[in-house]
Regions:
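Flexible, charged surface loops at secondary-structure boundaries
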Residues: 65-69, 146-152, 168-170
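Long, charge-dense
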Residues: 90-144
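Short, conserved loop/helix-junction motifs that constitute active-site signature segments
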Residues: 92-93, 167-171
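Active-site glycine-rich loop that binds ribose-phosphate moieties when present
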Residues: 130-165
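Gly/Ser/Thr-rich loops at beta-strand to alpha-helix junctions
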Residues: 77-86, 105-109, 159-163
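Short, well-ordered beta-strand core segments
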Residues: 72, 154-155, 173-174
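Proline-centered loop/turn at the N-terminus of a beta-strand
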Residues: 98, 172-173
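Electropositive, gly/pro-rich neighborhoods at or near active sites that engage anionic ligands
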Residues: 1-100
Length: 174
């Protein structure tokens, strides 16, 4: 990892980027995940790099919905695992939600790598059967029918949105 002084005005951003680059080398994050992160960071710049009041309200509402769910599932991709595995483990404990790995650029090896990062952080993973439960023409449609497939609430921390739209059409709260 590069030596980045904490006084640098983009310190958190640069450290985050370095973590993702390292995760690419470890097989956790797909190369395309770096582009996804950059798109998200662009919005962060536009929003002044702080959580807006409406964003904070949305976070609080999401937490209440997750806690009230009958069958909540946290759907985790490589970027989320690389950047927030410990926080996902803490959220799982607080919400009693299942954690399921769901990858757009899916290989058995990446699923194993992402799973290991999450388990090392304390997550208990749903490693059930995988089949196409979500009507999408790519691997994000693959999930466990007893996990994401039957969840009433699915937390999707980082994603472009087509799967979120499909999950909502299936009657899930996303």
């Amino acid at each position: 990892m590069s030596e980045i002084p904490p006084s640098h005005p983009r310190y958190i951003s640069l450290i985050t980027r370095e973590k993702l680059v390292q995760a690419v080398h470890e097989g956790i994050v797909a190369y395309e995940g770096l582009t996804s992160h950059g798109r998200g960071e662009a919005f962060d710049y536009l929003l002044g790099e702080k959580t807006s009041p409406s964003g904070l309200n949305a976070e609080k509402l999401a937490a209440r919905v997750l806690l009230a769910a009958k069958h909540p599932v946290l759907s985790i991709n490589g970027n989320t695992a690389a950047l927030a595995a410990k926080e996902i483990a803490d959220l799982q404990k607080a919400s009693d939600a299942e954690v399921e790995v769901n990858l757009f650029h899916r290989t058995d090896e990446r699923v194993k790598q992402v799973s290991k990062v999450l388990e090392d952080a304390g997550c208990v993973l749903n490693k059930g059967i995988v089949e196409r439960c979500i009507p999408l023409p790519h691997d994000r449609g693959l999930c466990d029918p007893r996990g994401i497939g039957s969840a009433d609430v699915v937390l999707v921390p980082l994603e472009d949105g087509d799967r979120c739209e499909a999950l909502v059409k299936m009657g899930k709260i996303v």
